[in-house]
Amino acid sequence: MGTNEKNMTAGSPGKLIITFAIPLMLGNIFQQFYTMADTMIVGQVVGVEALAAVGAGDWLVWLVLGIMTGITQGFSILVSQYYGAGEKENLKCAVAKSYIMTALLSVIVLAVSEGAVYHVLLFLQTPDNVIDLTMLYLRLIFAGVPIIAAYNIFAAILRALGNSRSPLIAMTVAAVINVGLDLLFVAVFGWGVAGAAIATVIAQGFSALYCLLVLRKIRDIRLEKEDFYRQPSMSLRLLKLGTPLAIQNVIISVGGLTVQYVINGFGFLFVAGFTATNKLYGILEMAAVFYGYAITTYVGQNLGAKKYQRIRKGVRSGTYMAVLTSVFISGMMVLIGRNILSLFVSGEPEQIRQVLDIAYKYLFIMAVFLWILYLLHVYRSAIQGLGNTLIPLASGIAEFVMRVSVALLLPKWIGEEGIYYAEICAWSSAAVLLIISYMILIRKYKDAKTSES
């Protein structure tokens, strides 16, 4: 079991970014595979209502997990900067404090989410025929928040050190375990949506354990007891980086919940169609997320090393690769998307036709405008790597305002199809803000003295 840290302050920027991102993308293919397997098994074995029940909880899951993802991603920014600067004592302290803060926050998030879930589902007008199943699914997922938080912080620290191979292995192991447990719990034991939720949490536990074992082998972050107590102010620095990203994800999630509120009013078949497409959304967004992780690590390490010209070169290379990748994925979804969507549904032929019509129309629109989402991830990640998490927070607010406005108003003017454009408009508003902000921020490093030769 290797440690595979990677110093990104020397070498070809484009090569470093792509070799860092590819293992993460491969890992996410497995992750999306088991997410899709969840949906396929539930949809095919249990039926359309169960599929709608899982889908009705999607944005609530995204909200809770987004808090932990944002916090841990923010923590990893400081870790990558200390690693790039070669400040080993500060690096160890940042890792130790990240563990403590993540554990405390996961307990708080667990308590709040379990207590609020039923009331939120009622507020969202979740269809009566699926609300009980949705609540069961969510309560089980939320019970696993500390496990999921552990995986997030362990994987975030590995990425900050330039190690993208170990998260790939962890996600691959989780995918295999999850699919196997899905088949056992849902298809054999007949546990329905509860079985799917339990399988997901157990699989995440295995991935967290693997990442922890890798971290324990890395000499630079072998923690001593005093690392957890030194520099109390370090916790505040971590929170200043992590909190805006968590709030950003909360704001984006609330916008998504507003969309879910509107969709719920269109009936459970519409919910099922949206659910099928949202499961493919992970594939659409997959490469963007991991180009983003690569760029955050790359920018953070080079900022710590004061190699500012490399930052500009790396972001430029990342932009080209991201746009080309988005065009390829869009073409694939347009060509074979409907066939993939058909794997998620079973039931009466007329129901299947309606669900697929809704799902493919939404998928087609997202595929056409996917390049905007990829630009959003590249520039948001670059800004985060520079240590600025307030501008990404502002972009989250822009997403929220646009997503909610379009979701509430456009369906009134052009009918149900108006809801399809909420995501596109949200991406566009955030991407414009982020690109302009990056151009302004990077200028201050233009004439700065660097450590580059």
Where are these regions (language model features)?
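Short alpha-helical transmembrane segments in multi-pass integral membrane proteins
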Residues: 1-21, 79-144, 188-243, 299-368, ...
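N-terminal transmembrane alpha-helices
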Residues: 8-45, 59-74, 78, 103-110, ...
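Transmembrane helical elements of multi-pass membrane transporters/channels
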Residues: 19-38, 140, 151, 174, ...
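Transmembrane alpha-helix boundary and packing residues in multipass membrane permease domains
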Residues: 24, 28, 40, 77, ...
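Helix-terminus/linker motif at the lipid-water interface of multi-pass membrane proteins
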Residues: 29, 33-52, 121-128, 184-191, ...
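Small-residue-rich hydrophobic transmembrane alpha-helices
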Residues: 51-111, 148-167, 273-337, 373-395
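Hydrophobic transmembrane alpha-helices of multi-pass small-molecule transporters
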Residues: 63, 178-182, 208-212, 283-286, ...
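Short runs within selected transmembrane alpha-helices of multi-pass transporters and secretion channels
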Residues: 72, 140-159, 167-175, 196-209, ...
